[in-house]
Amino acid sequence: MRYLRTFRWHSPLVLTLVVAGLSLPGAGPAAAADACAPLINPIACENSKPGTPKATWDVSGLGSAALQGFPTQISVNVGETVNFKIDSSATSYRVDIYRMGYYGGNGARLITSVNPAGRQSQPGCLSQASTGLVDCGNWAVSASWPVPSTAVSGIYFARLVRTDGTSGASHIPFVVRDDSSHSGVVFQTSDSTWQAYNQYGGNSLYVGSPAGRAYKVSYKARC
């Protein structure tokens, strides 16, 4: 369902990440050419690579109502698997995995594609009338991505793309960590704020029931 007040996860957080790229020094051609030299931060190296045009990876508003989902964990370590629970009325679709970054101003780079289990209509989400909580943890896993041990940490998203002859796509954001790395810079996402404004099911911490807003929200709901 769509409501007048909506919250789009990649604004403004991703704009900050894309502009900064988490690599502060030099942005010119010479800097990009040296970004993958020995002893250079792997994030600077990754962000110097060619990206995917925004027109290819972006979606309009909340994305397609026929493809909505969330990750079972908002954050995974390299080498772990991120699972996606997706409610879909599309007869076929694919899951493209992107990493956010500078990438020559493109904002994201396609990492890989994952084939989902197939069309999957999920059951109604669980709800709690006294608090307004909407929790879709009862959905089944639809697709998974084993994160390579060589993956570069950052904000990623799964782009759900219809392949049944009808256009439509949606995003599922998640974070890839590298718990073995060391850095003088730490980036913290605003994921608790994302969920506070998430109105999937009709409620958020600012609108809905039982008293004009919910008292509890869940990460287990459409992003």
Task: List the model feature ranges, each with a label.
Residues 2-32:
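Secretory targeting and sorting signals
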